[in-house]
Amino acid sequence: MAAEGSTQQRRRVMAAASAASTSGAGRCRLSKIGASRRPPPARVRVAVRLRPFVDGTAGASDPPCVRGMDSCSLEIANWRNHQETLKYQFDAFYGERSTQQDIYAGSVQPILRHLLEGQNASVLAYGPTGAGKTHTMLGSPEQPGVIPRALMDLLQLTREEGAEGRPWALSVTMSYLEIYQEKVLDLLDPASGDLVIREDCRGNILIPGLTQKPITSFADFERHFLPASRNRTVGATRLNQRSSRSHAVLLVKVDQRERLAPFRQREGKLYLIDLAGSEDNRRTGNKGLRLKESGAINTSLFVLGKVVDALNQGLPRVPYRDSKLTRLLQDSLGGSAHSILIANIAPERCFYLDTVSALNFAARSKEVINRPFTNESLQPHVLGPVKLSQKELLGPPEAKRARGPEEEEIGSPEPMAAPASASQKLSPLQKLSSMDPAMLERLLSLDRLLASQGSQGAPLLSTPKRERMVLMKTVEEKDLEIERLKTKQKELEAKMLAQKAEEKENHCPTMLRPLSHRTVTVAKPLKKAVVMPLQLIQEQAASPNAEIHILKNKGRKRKLESLDALEPEEKAEDCWELQISPELLAHGRQKILDLLNEGSARDLRSLQRIGPKKAQLIVGWRELHGPFSQVEDLERVEGITGKQMESFLKANILGLAAGQRCGPS
């Protein structure tokens, strides 16, 4: 018995410990929810469609180069080794006998349900030109494609989920655009011109100015879509008589608004994309405009391949911005959408290289990981009246302190007006007349409950009316007194400033006149001063018979005026100039000429601006032509220009004239 009791006791202790650990783990999970939880990954699903042979194409009678193995795999001949085949595995493979309904029901229809959960989805048709992408997306009246089937089912789902009595109200809008030569054009409004692609603060891709048409039925969709489809750019090439020259994108938005509290709002987007096909211009024979269009198409598809490779390799930079197409597909590839890629291929052997390229791109694309999440938020206009009602619960003094200065200037009702009743004060529905009737009825019932409970707990509303009026009057008197004090303070400050200005004028009589009363005079250009060497000045001063006046005073232009009347520009003018006597200049020139005719190469290098090479040139010229007759003959020496001659004279003539040693040593 004792053993059984101890066993039961141990079991109870273990159970309690297990429960405690479980509850602790639960609390830990609850505390981290929303902060560390990431949306589950969703891989890009890839389906391959093989179109049948087209009559009139080259090689239509040859056996196909692609063969399906089962519903998910296919094989194609290896061009490097004809004895082998290349095998590919995808999420779905649709052969030549597959119908439009098979492709839609097997790959596209399952993702439409995510739109009603506030998530994004996208369907892309990829492949070379003439492989059947547009037929897959649009189809024909007898065999409608993915776009009409998806819109028909989506509108049916929104009607069922948004019916009366259901918790959500749904609305659907559509936009249709094309990317033609790196320009985003609105097909619903062709006159709008090139549009820009933006990204909001939450990372959502949007196009400002893009037309949005509300649709409630498939007839509404056809009324907008069919005329817009005729605006898409198409052209004829050797391989395709109606080749798409642009990427077409149909954007369908599903907005959901909750009818009851907490009044959530969801938005789901569906991208239906018909990509233009890659082209080999050697086979299509494109020239002129067609060649330019083909270059833009191939460039954007090349960037699309770079984006897929960057996502698969985990590179830090994904080149979404290198092309308008990849910028628009940022949600679809590596973003927040459930994506389906339908790769269209052709069976003819002339399309072999294009088919291999499309299959390789599809194989890389199925490795891309997206992280879809629900785009959900609360309606902002529901929270506004509640905040207003909290201010209204306060009395006039408290409310006045709670309001900012801007609200005080805009103003509220007159303070002396009769206060409203308690039910009007507590009502948060004073500005909700434009709301949904069902939502308004629900909030009215909540308002009545709030009014019945709030009248018991609001101390200000229980205050007698006479006391409130006296209190409001006191507050007004204090406000008026504050305004009077502010006005008086401003007057005193103005008087103090005026007194300081007068004191400055009295203590500074020599102050310059204000700029508005000064007359501006342009200073005359200063005369150049010729500077004499100091050694020469001393020699001339020491000579008793010196009659050379080095400095000649030109005299004052006018007598100095008083300091008050003298302008700064006039003070700056100097009336002295320096001149050199012509005898000194002639003496210096003669010394230079003697040195040129009699000096050796070493002596010539003692002159300024004369180096070893020029000294040798001067000696050689002197031996051939004889002595120099004047200093200017130095310009005749080969290698000495006129400018060099001028700089030579300026550098040497004054020093030599002053008696510096320049003769042969």
Curated annotation (Swiss-Prot):
GO terms for cellular component: chromatin; cytosol; microtubule; microtubule associated complex; mitotic spindle; nuclear speck. It comes from the Eukaryota. SUPFAM superfamilies: P-loop containing nucleoside triphosphate hydrolases, RuvA domain 2-like. There is a cross-link at K465 (Glycyl lysine isopeptide (Lys-Gly) (interchain with G-Cter in SUMO2)). Gene3D superfamilies: AF1531-like domain (1.10.150.280), Kinesin motor domain (3.40.850.10). Pfam families: HHH_3 (PF12836), Kinesin (PF00225). GO terms for biological process: DNA repair; metaphase chromosome alignment; microtubule-based movement; mitotic metaphase chromosome alignment; mitotic spindle organization; sister chromatid cohesion; spindle elongation. Residues 43-368 form the Kinesin motor domain. InterPro entries: Hlx-hairpin-Hlx_DNA-bd_motif, Kinesin-like_fam, Kinesin_motor_CS, Kinesin_motor_dom, Kinesin_motor_dom_sf, P-loop_NTPase, RuvA_2-like. Keywords: ATP-binding, Coiled coil, Cytoplasm, Cytoskeleton, DNA-binding, Isopeptide bond, Microtubule, Motor protein, Nucleotide-binding, Nucleus, Phosphoprotein, Ubl conjugation. SMART domains: HhH1, KISc. The keyword Ubl conjugation applies. It is found in: Nucleus; Cytoplasm, Cytoskeleton. PROSITE patterns: KINESIN_MOTOR_1, KINESIN_MOTOR_2. Residues 1-20, 393-424 are annotated as: Disordered. Disulfide bonds: none annotated. GO terms for molecular function: ATP binding; DNA binding; microtubule binding; microtubule motor activity. Residues 412-424 have a biased composition (Low complexity). Residues 465-508 form a coiled coil. ATP binds at G127, P128, T129, G130, A131, G132, K133, T134. The modification Phosphoserine is found at S412, S427, S452, S543, S562, S581. Interacts with FAM83D and SIAH1. Kinesin family member that is involved in spindle formation and the movements of chromosomes during mitosis and meiosis. Binds to microtubules and to DNA. Plays a role in congression of laterally attached chromosomes in NDC80-depleted cells. Belongs to the TRAFAC class myosin-kinesin ATPase superfamily. Kinesin family. This is Kinesin-like protein KIF22. It comes from Pongo abelii. The lineage of its organism: Eukaryota, Metazoa, Chordata, Craniata, Vertebrata.
